[in-house]
């Protein structure tokens, strides 16, 4: 059985799952524990507990329970009514009220109702139970209320679910922050497996904690010694007389399970499990980790690891060095998540050499529980973190990660390296869309792009971008001035800028005139500005002051190549004085004597100019930061409420095909579904026998397109399965000839279609293919016969909005074709964007759709819309199943 892990407001976990008959004894205990006031709030009157029990165990459409320590602490039910409405009822144990549990269960049930096509949700609430009404409103549901005798009936439409998801993510942030605080801001720590031997992991970790002067209590646990490194030791966690917030576990894996149980009994809030020997070693370790997970979930404990390096918080409020490396990090304003423990050791050394200090560091290991989703929400509000770095090897809940990251990257940059170049794992695909997306890293790119995350290919690039954003303002545009004392280096910088999407514009005439007045006659004041090798150090300051006043540039690359006559310290001071004069209004980076990082001579009085060893490195880092700036400074997106659609009819079509063992929907089924989602198609007649063609097209005028469909017919033009401009009067003869030709070559033809000819337009593609982890991926781009050859497409994870669709189109190399290229008519780009958004909604609401292919979509002249003239939909039970939006993850319970 599966369930959902829910984070309460205090950061602890509970499990929510379906109620089953064997839970009867648990539900009896739950009812017995309820106060009269709680019962009255749920049932509008004081009700005998026998009647409460009967009501709660009644077999309803959907009944869920929340558990902590194997005891039921909340109950929720969805009651299906007539005419498309459903009723929700929730009751929470007195001890767990006002912790966000009722709100989470409400979200779970509301999402289930939405998936089932419910058009209105109702709940009868006691007038005194204002918390229920407040919860609905706070989640963003458009709530209406109506007074009834002794009760208030509240109702809301699931169409406001997108806003509810966003609001719940904001509420969920507090829970995630409180959970991470267990680990990064503990008041007391136990180290189980602490040792006096500093060559052991437990010994070095305990030494690091002591040496960091941790601002709290530290308790070593070792059954074999009275003292560890001079501190009184305890034989067991249970022997410690004081509360323990976090326990570091550094014992063999088979012992760690027993220790975790003892920590739960002790009331420990979180475990940092350094120990290896879990899922990373195979089946035996996976079973061990599953056992560990059950124990921690039972007690509501949170976990970092197992198989991790530990955690660091360099804040003066905490002073926590809870990791086993002999290296120490310097204090700074960057926070780092590493999924690799070994990499973490190197990070301390690299960041110190680059002059990049760390605010905090977390090695998540196998990510049993605490993951990037939790940590980035903590760092979002951490006043000591300016830049977030992520080294990821896998994703747990990428859909939720994307939603959270979209919010955070508007405030702080997130820079990520995703190792392994994830292979999307699409099943054997048979459509144009599937072929474009199969076996690629495109899912990760799409996730990062639409979340505002800066993706770098290497750790070296990550630190280049980090040193820039940690020390300079985010660029407000892509216009770059290059100031150099060596012409060749300036040309290299200019080439690299333009190769990575930056513009090196001609400077304003007034700027060039000012530069001519101060620079040698042989200097070039074009952009790049070559001051020449013989220039004096003070020319850097004067030139930067002039460039700082030029509003036609956004960033400056300053290059210094060491000549014999200049002292680098003098040049550095000159650069700092120049930068100081324009007060962070522009982003400045330097290429300073092949120096990398944040060198001491380029920092003074709060002004810090990062240095790169080569012009290309500076340009690439600046380009990444500029792309992020475009995201950061873009206006917030409005969430449009979705119009209701006949979801039940769509589900009926899909389930009917699956029941019949069919993967591909028929043309008529596809056409019906597309119509329900307002995706325009052409006038069509379907037939199985050419004799039917004349009957089905009786009364049609002009010419038609004739097409054949079958399981192996994908690229119709390649096999003679499409003929255009067929006179209606000759449709039977043409259909006969096409059918005979296909069958003679071994193709099975299931049916044929005749379509009205669409006026001339631009052939585009719109489609989706489902990934088992990331969900449906939406694709848009140039379509037609050459789609797989050109591969000029853009992708996003569903769902998308109109702004996302606009960005997708802008990313196409051939975007200008839609915009009146070389005097052609401007196409209806808005209509095409609507198609992409509606495709996104269709596949999001129907995860059984494995592939959807609209190719081509003919985009007509502006104002005339567009038409999908060929389409295919493949369905299956193995489609993407996203965790509920209120859940941290799906659990096996």
Regions found by a protein language model. Give the residues of each.
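Catalytic-core regions of core metabolic enzymes
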Residues: 159-893
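Long, contiguous binding/interaction regions
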Residues: 1-175, 179-180
């Amino acid at each position: 059985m599966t369930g959902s892990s829910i984070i309460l407001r205090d950061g602890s976990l509970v499990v929510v799952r379906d109620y089953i008959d064997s839970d009867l004894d648990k539900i009896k205990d739950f009812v017995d524990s309820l106060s009269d006031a709680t019962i009255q709030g749920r049932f509008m009157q004081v009700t005998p507990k026998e009647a409460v029990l009967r009501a709660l165990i009644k077999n309803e459409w959907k009944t869920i329970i929340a558990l902590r320590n194997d005891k039921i602490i909340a109950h929720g039910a969805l009651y299906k009514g007539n005419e498309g409405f459903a009723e929700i009822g929730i009751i929470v144990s007195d001890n767990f009220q006002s912790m966000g549990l009722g709100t989470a269960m409400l979200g779970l049930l509301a999402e289930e109702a939405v998936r089932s096509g419910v058009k209105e949700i109702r709940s009868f609430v006691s007038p005194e139970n204002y918390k229920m009404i407040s919860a609905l409103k706070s989640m963003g549901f458009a709530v209406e209320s109506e007074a009834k005798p002794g009760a208030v009936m509240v109702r809301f439409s699931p169409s406001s679910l997108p806003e509810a998801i966003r609001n719940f993510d904001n509420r969920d942030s507090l829970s995630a922050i409180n959970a991470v605080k267990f680990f990064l801001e503990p008041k007391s720590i136990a180290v189980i497996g602490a040792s006096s031997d500093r060559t052991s992991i437990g010994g070095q970790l305990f030494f690091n904690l002591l040496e960091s002067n941790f601002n709290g209590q530290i308790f070593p646990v070792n059954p074999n010694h009275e003292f560890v490194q001079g501190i009184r030791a305890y034989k067991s966690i249970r022997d410690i007389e004081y509360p323990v917030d976090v326990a570091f576990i550094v014992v063999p894996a088979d012992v760690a399970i027993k220790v975790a149980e003892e920590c739960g009994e002790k009331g420990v809030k979180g475990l940092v499990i350094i120990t290896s020997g879990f899922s990373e070693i195979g089946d035996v370790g996976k079973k061990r980790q599953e056992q560990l997970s059950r124990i921690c979930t039972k007690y509501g404990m949170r976990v970092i690891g197992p198989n991790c390096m530990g955690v660091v918080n360099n804040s003066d409020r905490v002073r926590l060095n809870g990791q086993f490396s002999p290296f120490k990090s310097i204090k700074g304003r960057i926070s780092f998540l590493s999924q690799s423990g070994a990499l973490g050791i190197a990070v301390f050394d690299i960041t110190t050499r680059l002059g990049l200090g760390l605010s905090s560091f977390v090695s998540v290991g196998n990510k049993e529980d605490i993951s990037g989703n939790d940590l980035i929400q903590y760092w979002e509000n951490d006043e000591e973190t300016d830049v977030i770095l992520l080294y990821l090897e896998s994703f747990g809940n990428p859909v939720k990660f994307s939603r959270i990251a979209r919010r955070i990257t508007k405030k702080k940059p997130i820079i990520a390296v995703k190792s392994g170049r994830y292979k999307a794992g699409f099943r054997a695909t048979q459509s144009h869309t599937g072929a474009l997306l199969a076996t690629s890293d495109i899912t990760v790119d799409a996730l990062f792009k639409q979340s505002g995350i800066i993706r770098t290919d290497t750790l070296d690039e990550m630190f280049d971008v980090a040193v820039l954003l940690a020390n300079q303002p985010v660029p407000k545009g892509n216009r770059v001035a290059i100031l150099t004392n060596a012409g060749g280096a300036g040309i290299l910088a200019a080439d690299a800028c333009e190769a990575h999407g930056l513009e090196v514009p001609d400077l304003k005439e007034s700027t060039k005139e000012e530069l001519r007045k101060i620079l040698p006659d042989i200097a070039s004041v074009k952009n790049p500005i070559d001051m020449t090798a013989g220039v004096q150090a003070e020319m850097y300051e004067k030139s930067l002051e002039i460039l700082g006043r030029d509003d036609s540039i956004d960033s400056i690359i300053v290059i210094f190549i060491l000549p014999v006559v200049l002292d680098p310290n003098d040049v550095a001071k000159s650069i700092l004085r120049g930068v100081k004069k324009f007060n962070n209004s522009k982003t400045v980076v330097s290429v300073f004597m092949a120096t990398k990082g944040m060198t001491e001579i380029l920092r003074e009085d709060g002004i810090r100019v990062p240095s790169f060893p080569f012009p290309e490195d500076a340009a690439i880092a600046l380009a990444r930061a500029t792309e992020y700036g475009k995201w950061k400074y873009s206006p917030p997106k409005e969430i449009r409420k979705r119009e209701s659609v006949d979801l039940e009819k769509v589900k009926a079509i899909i389930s009917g095909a699956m029941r019949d063992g069919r993967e591909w929907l028929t043309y008529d089924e596809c056409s019906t579904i597309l119509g329900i989602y307002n995706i325009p198609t052409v006038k069509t007649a379907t037939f199985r026998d050419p004799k039917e063609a004349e009957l089905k097209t009786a009364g049609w005028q002009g010419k038609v397109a004739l097409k054949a469909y079958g399981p192996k017919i994908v690229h119709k033009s390649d096999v003679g399965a499409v003929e255009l401009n067929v006179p209606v009067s000759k449709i039977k003869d043409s259909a006969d000839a096409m059918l005979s030709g296909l069958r003679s070559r071994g193709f099975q033809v299931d049916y044929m279609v005749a379509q009205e000819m669409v006026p001339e337009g631009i052939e585009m593609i719109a489609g989706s293919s489902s990934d088992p982890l990331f969900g449906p991926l939406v694709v848009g781009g140039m379509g037609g016969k050459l789609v797989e050859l050109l591969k000029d497409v853009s992708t996003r994870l569903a769902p998308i909005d109109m702004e996302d669709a606009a960005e997708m189109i802008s990313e196409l190399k051939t975007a200008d074709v839609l915009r009146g290229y070389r005097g052609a008519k401007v196409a209806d780009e808005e209509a095409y964007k609507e198609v992409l958004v509606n495709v996104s909604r269709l596949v999001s609401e129907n995860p059984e759709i494995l592939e959807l292919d609209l190719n081509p979509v003919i985009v007509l002249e502006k104002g005339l819309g567009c038409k999908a003239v060929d389409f295919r939909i493949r369905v299956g039970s193995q489609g993407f199943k996203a965790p509920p939006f209120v859940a941290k993850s799906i659990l096996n319970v």
